[in-house]
């Protein structure tokens, strides 16, 4: 299993959560059928606009999809945050230490 640091995490103008890996790309993430997508231009994984799931649940889904693709994504000391409220950031950070595909 490869490990990659998450360069940045944010919420875009459409309300979608995105996660940008430092070095890995995921052009085939759609094959996991998890509603997680790869944005080629922004070089990031992203969720649909949350409906029933919270942003934390979508973060776990993105991390799980990457795990199924053979990469463990980890939040690092240098991870940048964009458009994420402090309480949501804390919740995402708290969830990042859990098993990548547990209880999504």
Q: Can you say where each PLM-predicted feature lies in the sequence?
A:
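Accessory DNA-engaging acidic/polar modules
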Residues: 1-104
